[in-house]
């Protein structure tokens, strides 16, 4: 019909209406079809082989909880109760027992919906939230029946589980958009998508701490902080609320982000000199005096009231040329304010903030690690600067500041697997024919086709999605060693440290911040026959066993949030031809020091690559969520299934668990 915009109507660029969303099917939603012959066939056993002896080097050993502070309750609204279901896990969901009735209303729970949310809500029109300075793209309206799994009350007041879930779902969508669109706008587009679909929490502005966010948590964009309520401004450095006292209204500062790029901002971990907002010169205006309004006025009022202000410190991201990492450094008190002339000659407001006592170190830890890396100070308790003796691409420190132990028991360090039995494809392995590097979207690459048409990594280090198995390029592939599909075979990407724990032996942590999906290491050792290790408790302490029962969790993106057919969702269950058993007692790498946790921050992923005409399985570890420096790296060891306990809920491990998590199941192994 004339005058009615249809599917083939070309809009007038001078009269563009953003309320009209074109129904255009993107190319990334079309799944390519490849011949069955290019798909990887099943595996069978084949004769053993192992790495050369040059890969090994011998290693010889040489002869609290944050208190709660009472703060004035200055929050604007208090009538929304915090949900009673507050799982403490910040990494992934596990099955929980509920006393209430199970949902039987027939309402479909959306993918990634937090368990425990069974309320049925009326369908409501979803729009992008009206956030100040929010730079998000116009996104396509999704189906009105999409269920975010987050109730209205949970959007106002969150908890640790909801914060973890929102951040995990956001980053999963961001990774997928980056994988298929190859643009830098994936972050803002992912944020707009989640906001328009109600995937967020802690929307109620508040003074003081934010439920579910801990001191030391790190973020890789301001939008992440906005989604979980830590700092609602995506551009402005000062966030505030309007507090009502009778008929009077008064603004109070809730949080600030210190980017470290303004003159006078101190780098002291216990105090901060913060510059006010406004008055900056740009292409449309000259510099001017700052005014006592908006955020500046809110900081002045908070100085007078004495309320705590959340402080987020921004630091350069070493892995990105332009990116930043934001560290939540806890609550600060404003001690004084003044006005001084800036470099432009205009008046600038200055505020001194002092960190409140009794909080765990966050930014202070960050600055200490920077000094260790630069060689300005020596790591306390350092035993060896590199226990790998050069076997890894990066040194791995050995540290003990707990007792007099000088090192772990003797073992030979190796950076890869030693196979006594290998897995072989029933058909010959076919490598790619790429020159230089395998490119995203190149469907002529056989290695990419094995990964269902996608390059599994971003920037050669970040895993996009968990898969039944991932295929990497092998020796017969002509692509060079820096190919983005050669990740686990190129060694460590982060500076790691083996350290002595207080009650669990030796552990592993990183000096670098780890973004969700970051490759950490593979599990190196000797591949063993199941029958030779069963019952050997001493050797079992250094065994990785794929046949164990592991807690399930959701990590991948939700297809509905990236405009993909739900039937194309990538399965997260691993698909191995037979159980893989690796012993790291005699031969191993840093992975042998990773402790178990029932609430881990690391997960494992099978990776296959060709070697000498055979397809060999490797076990790679990736960050489950953003991990700050000096946080212990842990994964789920699983529980060995027994004939007496077929029901997973009745499984009991061989060793007592000391992870200390509130979700601790009591045993593992």
UniProtKB/Swiss-Prot annotation:
**Which stretches does UniProt call biased (Polar residues)?**
65-82, 93-107
- This entry's Enzyme Commission designation comes to 2.1.1.367
| Span of domain YDG | 208-355
| Catalytic reaction annotation | L-lysyl(9)-[histone H3] + S-adenosyl-L-methionine = N(6)-methyl-L-lysyl(9)-[histone H3] + S-adenosyl-L-homocysteine + H(+)
Locate the Post-SET domain: which residues?
A: 653-669
Q: Which UniProt keywords apply?
A: Centromere, Chromatin regulator, Chromosome, DNA-binding, Metal-binding, Methyltransferase, Nucleus, S-adenosyl-L-methionine, Transferase, Zinc
Q: Which SMART domains match?
A: PreSET (SM00468), SET (SM00317), SRA (SM00466)
Q: What is known of its domains?
A: Although the SET domain contains the active site of enzymatic activity, both pre-SET and post-SET domains are required for methyltransferase activity. In the pre-SET domain, Cys residues bind 3 zinc ions that are arranged in a triangular cluster; some of these Cys residues contribute to the binding of two zinc ions within the cluster.
Q: What does this protein do?
A: Histone methyltransferase. Methylates 'Lys-9' of histone H3. H3 'Lys-9' methylation represents a specific tag for epigenetic transcriptional repression.
Q: What is this protein called?
A: Histone-lysine N-methyltransferase, H3 lysine-9 specific SUVH3
């Amino acid at each position: 019909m004339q005058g009615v915009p249809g599917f083939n109507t070309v809009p007038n660029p001078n009269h563009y209406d953003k309320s009209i969303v074109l129904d255009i099917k993107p190319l990334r939603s079309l799944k390519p079809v490849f011949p069955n012959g290019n798909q990887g066939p099943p595996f069978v056993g084949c004769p053993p082989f192992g790495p050369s002896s040059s890969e090994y080097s011998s290693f010889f050993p040489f002869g609290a909880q944050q208190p709660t502070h009472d703060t004035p309750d200055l929050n604007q609204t208090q009538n929304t109760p915090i949900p009673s279901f507050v799982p403490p896990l910040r990494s992934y969901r596990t099955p929980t027992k509920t006393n209430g009735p199970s949902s039987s209303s027939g309402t479909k729970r959306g993918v990634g919906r937090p368990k425990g949310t069974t309320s049925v809500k009326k369908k409501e029109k979803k729009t992008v939230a009206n956030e100040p300075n929010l730079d998000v793209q116009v996104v396509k309206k999704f189906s009105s029946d999409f269920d975010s799994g987050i109730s209205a009350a949970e959007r106002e007041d969150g908890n640790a589980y909801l914060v973890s879930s929102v951040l995990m779902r956001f980053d999963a969508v961001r990774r997928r958009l980056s994988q298929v669109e190859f643009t830098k706008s994936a972050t803002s587009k992912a944020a707009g998508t989640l906001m328009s679909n109600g995937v967020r929490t802690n929307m109620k502005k508040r003074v003081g701490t934010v439920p579910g966010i801990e001191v030391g948590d790190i973020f890789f964009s301001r939008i992440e902080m906005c989604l979980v309520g830590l700092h609602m401004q995506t551009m402005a450095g000062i966030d505030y609320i309007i507090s009502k006292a009778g008929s009077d209204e008064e603004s109070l500062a809730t949080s600030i982000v210190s980017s470290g790029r303004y003159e006078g901002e101190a780098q002291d971990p216990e105090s901060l000199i913060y510059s006010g907002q406004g008055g900056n010169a740009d292409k449309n205006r000259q510099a001017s005096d700052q005014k006592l309004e908006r955020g500046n006025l809110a900081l002045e009022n908070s100085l007078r009231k004495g309320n705590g202000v959340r402080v987020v410190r921004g630091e350069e991201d070493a892995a990105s040329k332009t990116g930043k990492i934001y560290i939540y450094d806890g609550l600060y008190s404003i001690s004084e304010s003044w006005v001084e002339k800036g470099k432009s000659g205009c008046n600038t407001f200055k505020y001194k903030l002092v960190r409140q006592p009794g909080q765990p170190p966050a930014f202070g830890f960050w600055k200490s690690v920077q000094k260790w890396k630069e060689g300005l100070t020596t790591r306390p308790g350092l035993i060896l600067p590199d226990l790998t003796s050069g076997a890894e691409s990066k040194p791995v420190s050995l540290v003990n500041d707990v007792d007099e132990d000088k090192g772990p028991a003797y073992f030979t360090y190796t950076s890869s697997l030693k196979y006594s039995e290998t897995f072989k494809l029933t058909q010959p392995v076919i490598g790619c024919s790429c020159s230089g590097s395998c490119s995203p979207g190149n469907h002529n690459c056989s290695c990419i086709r094995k990964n269902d048409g996608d390059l599994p990594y971003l920037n050669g280090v970040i895993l996009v999605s968990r898969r039944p198995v991932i295929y990497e390029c092998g020796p017969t592939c002509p692509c060079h060693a820096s190919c983005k599909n050669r990740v686990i075979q190129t060694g460590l990407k982060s500076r790691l440290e083996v350290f002595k724990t207080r009650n669990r032996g030796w552990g592993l942590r990183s000096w670098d911040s780890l973004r969700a999906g970051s490759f950490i290491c593979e599990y190196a050792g000797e591949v063993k026959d199941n029958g030779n290790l069963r019952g050997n408790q001493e050797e079992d302490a250094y065994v990785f066993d794929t046949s164990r029962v592991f807690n399930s969790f959701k990590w991948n993106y939700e297809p509905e949030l990236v405009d993909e057919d739900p039937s194309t969702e990538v399965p997260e269950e691993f698909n191995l031809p037979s159980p893989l058993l690796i012993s790291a007692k005699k031969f191993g790498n840093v992975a042998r020091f990773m402790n178990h946790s029932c609430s881990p921050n690391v997960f494992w992923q099978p990776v296959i690559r060709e070697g000498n005409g055979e397809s060999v399985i490797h076990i790679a570890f990736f960050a489950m969520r953003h991990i700050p420096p000096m946080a212990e790296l842990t994964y789920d060891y699983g529980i060995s299934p027994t004939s007496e306990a077929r029901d997973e809920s009745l499984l009991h491990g061989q060793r007592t668990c000391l992870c200390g998590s509130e979700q601790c199941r009591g045993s593992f192994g």
